[in-house]
UniProtKB/Swiss-Prot annotation:
Disulfide-bond pairs as recorded: none
PROSITE patterns listed in its UniProt record: AP2_ERF
PANTHER family assigned to the protein according to its UniProt record, in alphabetical order: AP2 DOMAIN CLASS TRANSCRIPTION FACTOR, ETHYLENE-RESPONSIVE TRANSCRIPTION FACTOR 8
Record feature DNA-binding region, as residue ranges: 30-87
Underlying gene: ERF8
Protein name: Ethylene-responsive transcription factor 8
GO molecular function: DNA-binding transcription factor activity; transcription cis-regulatory region binding
Length: 185
């Protein structure tokens, strides 16, 4: 019987120099919940343990930013039991703070400073609320006619704006409701 293995298909273009391939893998650190896009940016996502769905955390310029976004979301979802990329937060355990900071491996466990991640690429749980711009209606019939107060311009380069639409030519408003069907002709 032939030897059949299940899993990933072998790479058709295997590197001829295995040490070269290993050095590339050593340079590229892989973080939990982070994928590298083909164009070089990093995408972060996490699985919601309650809804069993993927939650999009955003696209980031560096893998570390994406990993921090994943860590923050993991702590929100799973609390202190969360598996994170950067270890425990400094100051969360006062008994270890003196020994961890003084140890030579402290850099591995110190969490980088908090970044404002909402500016980087949007969050999955936040919805953009459209801005409402005020709309001003200017009803000419309710305001007194504007006067120039004796100011006149002799310049040919100045422009004149007629707010009154002509003297005494105010048309009555249309009795029109756009929620109704158009009137029969």
């Amino acid at each position: 019987m032939p030897n059949i293995t299940m899993g990933l298909k072998p790479d058709p273009v295997a590197p001829t120099n295995p040490t070269h391939h290993e050095s590339n893998a050593a340079k590229e650190i892989r973080y939990r919940g982070v994928r590298k896009r083909p164009w070089g940016r990093y995408a972060a996502e996490i699985r919601d343990p309650v809804k069993k769905t993927r939650v999009w955390l955003g696209t980031f310029d560096t893998a570390q930013q994406a990993a921090r976004a994943y860590d923050a979301a993991a702590r929100d979802f799973r609390g202190v039991k969360a598996k994170t990329n950067f270890g425990v937060i400094v100051g969360s355990s006062p008994t270890q703070s003196s020994t961890v900071v003084d140890s030579p491996t402290a850099a591995r466990f110190i969490t980088p400073p908090h970044l404002e991640l909402s500016l980087g690429g949007g969050g999955a749980c936040r919805r953009k609320i459209p801005l409402v711009h005020p709309v001003y209606y200017y009803n000419m019939a309710t305001y007194p006619k504007m006067t120039t107060c004796g100011v006149q311009s002799e310049s040919e380069t100045s422009s004149v704006v007629d707010f009154e639409g002509g003297a005494g030519k105010i048309s009555p408003p249309l009795d029109l409701d756009l929620n109704l069907a158009p009137p029969a002709e």
